[in-house]
């Protein structure tokens, strides 16, 4: 490309909030990229980037309010960590006393549809301290075991029924900007580079990719330790003789380690045997395993990979490779050391890594963990939850981290957490909301992520309808619509 042609291309890209070098490097195109290479493919009122639990609920909530909504995802199904990542079960949706379901709305609809299709056990029937919660004795009351394959179908059905347009195999590349206002996004699809023009955008990528690219400030992990929580590659097994496994665990329950009054440490006695034989080198001393819908099926949350940066392809590749190595070690462990696990079969490993922490996008308000501990319900509450503060050790080895069931019955999550600083026309939702590292450790799990997604979709719809900004939208209107959509608030 001649210098004059390059400058002309760079000027075109600059008008869209892009620069040619950054776009070229993002997409793997050579230096012959022209404006015509970016197809002006879609025009929509709302663009939701990321089809995980939070993005799905954002899209459904907005579409039900009559907003033309496009939901894009880099994969070939909806559900993110719950489907592609095989993460399960859904953590608690009840208050801390275990008496009342408080995360309702779209989350409850999803659960009910799963149960109707034989794809879940209802949380009202699941108690903590049992095989459904890895025998963890607190903070896990009323979890929801589910089948990830049925969950894919339920999410897709609910989106299509609401009128959401879904676009799979569409990876976010760049934000389209006009000053501080986001106007859409460039996607990389099998068709090439495609531009989506949108009146509003919701970042549900988990890693805050859209907000960060648009110029919103953020921190990566915990600013004090300069680390992120470790990642895990989940996997599922079947052909387990669950009766024999349970019979091995129950007599050892009094030996379980107690932290902040919480009893956990499943199969630590079997891990000790494997370690003594030189057949265990994982950075854990016990096994987190959750019985699933079918009696012989279990979800394993035990692999541990430290210092994973999911925004770096090489780093993430190394983590995924190490995760699969650890899965092989764990399968050997089940076959050789766990009663009932001798004939266990590997059903599948997550096609994406279970990432606990990466970017925290910053808003004018950053939710502190102390507000959760104190049970604060803010004036602009959009979701009530009681999920425990669960910060996995980032330092390496089995030690470290923080697990603390909340001392109040519930806490409230404010609308302000969904509003990024310095960027207009954008909401954030899911794991990347404006919260400190420890607070994010509580609300990163799927039920609150779904509730926050529903709130962000409602807020975005109101901003579009009323032609206002995220910071000026009337909270009274948000609350009214949340209540209309069966969200529990007090």
Model-derived features: positions:
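Mobile, glycine-rich extracellular loop/lid and propeptide segments
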Residues: 53, 60, 171, 198
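Flavin (FAD/FMN)-binding glycine-rich loop and adjacent Rossmann-like elements that form
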Residues: 106, 125, 137-138, 145-146, ...
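N-terminal export signals
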Residues: 5-28
